């Protein structure tokens, strides 16, 4: 029962990790279904069911895999350790913000089971999501699921902000705090500011569907484009919410593996804050095709390109950290290097898409799918694997099998590239997103992509095997490498005590 009412940040972080990993398996299964459908021409199921799977895949991966693992799992576990706090600021609220997630997930699963399921895409645009096109309760259940997940995130965000601002050890100033803690801080501010807008938009959609209002119905003087503006005002900060903790983890692991402080720490902090602020003023680049004014499109093109500058600062700072260092090529370092390379590639396709004139042609094609999967599937997910490999000894006191972990990286690296690189070609050839069938001219790249997807499932299974093997063989961490400069290793015994590091303070030299 202690897991149900535990208020210890380590227990709650572990719960988040387990929940996120489990949902990650569900999301991976859904993605395999998508790729099996597209692996051959002809259809396995009908178009609506295909769209239900696509929608569920997106929601599960974003709200129930990446966010719980990165912010809930690594955030809860590491932030108190890194700032020298005994626990989070509001431990019971922390417990509640986790236990809101399983009901949210159950609601999402139920939404695909009632009527025909919610086949709207993750953006839930009206009029497709209106009562006219989706008459059953499925979209309503999906909306309630999002409400619960959003409440969970907002409670967690308040908790992290108060913890980081008020519970640092004496002498632990904000300049000394790890970049991972900074990334969580920026992320939770984004969550706190953007989620209420999403909640407003989907509540308006709920009343449109059930109470005959017409916020998004032109027949009653509403405008479906209003929904798009509200949704993307949340949706764009959301993609930075997914990647910023990854940035922090990469900086943290890189600093430890290169045995020195990350290059340009202050610049890194300012870059993250800039990305956070700019993320709020570029939302309409998702809507270049809705008939906006040319001046508006020019502004959003320029603003989107400016985000590339702080992102570039981060990439070059990572490269400068590696440059001239004696890097320890551990499994977590492999993931970090893979992250830097593939995230940069995804960023380059993002620059292409930020041009409104090009985006008119590429909008809703597989080029966009390839872009955001390079950033998420090889950015966020690679960062999660890097963090898991790096912090596994802190969380369990055991060590993973190093050679197997490296082999798993190689398999995964080949698999995800094989899955998503061909999709750039499909997009340039004009294959649209969210369709379950396609002309035979697209067959070759789709088949290659589906083989890659199958291979990535094997990579995930290999990961499960590695974790299982680590618990089975019980290789304890005997001593901590003296070159690991960061706070969470300083206790010297793992996992750390129930309330560790209560009496530690920092001396200015």
Curated annotation (Swiss-Prot):
GO biological process: electron transport coupled proton transport; mitochondrial electron transport, cytochrome c to oxygen
Binding site for Ca(2+): 37, 42
Domain of life of the source: Eukaryota
Xref: PROSITE patterns: COX1, COX1_CUB
Record Gene3D superfamilies: Cytochrome c oxidase-like, subunit I domain
Subcellular location: Mitochondrion inner membrane
Keywords: Calcium, Copper, Electron transport, Heme, Iron, Magnesium, Membrane, Metal-binding, Mitochondrion, Mitochondrion inner membrane, Respiratory chain, Translocase, Transmembrane, Transmembrane helix, Transport
UniProt cross-link 1'-histidyl-3'-tyrosine (His-Tyr), position: 236-240
Alphabetical list of Pfam families matching this protein: COX1
Record's subunit section: Component of the cytochrome c oxidase (complex IV, CIV), a multisubunit enzyme composed of a catalytic core of 3 subunits and several supernumerary subunits. The complex exists as a monomer or a dimer and forms supercomplexes (SCs) in the inner mitochondrial membrane with ubiquinol-cytochrome c oxidoreductase (cytochrome b-c1 complex, complex III, CIII).
The protein, known as: Cytochrome c oxidase subunit 1
Source species of the chain: Albinaria caerulea (Land snail)
Lineage: Eukaryota, Metazoa, Spiralia, Lophotrochozoa, Mollusca
Gene name tied to this protein: COI
């Amino acid at each position: 029962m202690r897991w149900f009412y535990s208020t210890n940040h380590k227990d709650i972080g572990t719960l988040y990790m387990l929940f996120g990993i489990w949902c990650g398996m569900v999301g991976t299964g859904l993605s395999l279904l998508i790729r099996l459908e597209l692996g051959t021409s002809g259809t396995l199921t009908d178009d609506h069911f295909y769209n239900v799977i696509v929608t569920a895949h997106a929601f599960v991966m974003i709200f129930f895999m990446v966010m719980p693992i990165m912010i809930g799992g690594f955030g809860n576990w590491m932030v108190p350790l890194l700032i020298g706090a005994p626990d989070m600021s509001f431990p019971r609220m922390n417990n509640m913000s986790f236990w809101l997630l399983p009901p949210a997930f159950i609601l999402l699963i139920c939404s695909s089971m009632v009527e025909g399921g919610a086949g709207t895409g993750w953006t839930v645009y009206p009029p497709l999501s209106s009562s006219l096109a989706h008459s059953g309760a499925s979209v309503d259940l999906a909306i309630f699921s999002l409400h619960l997940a959003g409440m969970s995130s907002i409670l967690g965000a308040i908790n992290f902000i108060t913890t980081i601002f008020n519970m640092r050890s004496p002498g632990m100033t904000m300049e000394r705090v790890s970049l991972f803690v900074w990334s969580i801080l920026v992320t939770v501010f984004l969550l706190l500011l953007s989620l209420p807008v999403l909640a407003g938009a989907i509540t308006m959609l709920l009343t449109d569907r059930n109470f005959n209002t017409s916020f998004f119905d032109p027949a009653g003087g509403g405008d479906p484009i209003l929904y798009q503006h509200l949704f993307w005002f949340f949706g764009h900060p959301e993609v930075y919410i997914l990647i910023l903790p990854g940035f922090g983890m990469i900086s943290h692991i890189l600093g430890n593996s290169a045995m020195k402080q990350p290059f340009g720490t202050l610049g890194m902090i300012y870059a993250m804050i800039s990305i956070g602020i700019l993320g709020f003023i570029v939302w309409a680049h998702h809507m270049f095709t809705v008939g906006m004014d040319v001046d508006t499109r020019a502004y959003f093109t320029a603003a989107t390109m400016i985000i590339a500058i702080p992102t570039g600062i981060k990439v070059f700072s990572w490269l400068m950290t590696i440059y001239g260092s004696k890097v320890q090529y551990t499994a977590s370092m492999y993931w970090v290097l893979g992250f830097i390379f593939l995230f940069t590639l995804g960023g380059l396709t993002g620059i292409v898409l930020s041009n409104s004139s090009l985006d008119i042609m590429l909008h809703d094609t597989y080029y966009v799918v390839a872009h955001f999967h390079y950033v998420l599937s090889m950015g966020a997910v690679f960062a999660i694997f890097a963090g898991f490999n790096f912090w596994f000894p802190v969380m369990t006191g055991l060590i993973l099998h190093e050679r197997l972990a490296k082999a798993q990286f190689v398999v995964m690296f080949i698999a995800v590239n094989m899955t998503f690189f061909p999709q750039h070609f499909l997009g340039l050839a004009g294959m649209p997103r969210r369709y379950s069938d396609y002309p035979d001219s697209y067959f070759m790249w789709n088949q290659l992509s589906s083989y890659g997807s199958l291979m990535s499932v094997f990579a995930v299974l290999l990961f499960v095997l590695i974790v299982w093997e680590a618990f089975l063989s019980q290789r304890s961490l005997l001593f901590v490498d003296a070159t690991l400069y960061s706070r969470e290793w300083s206790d010297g015994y793992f996992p750390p005590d129930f309330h560790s590091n209560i009496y530690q303070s920092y001396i200015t030299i």
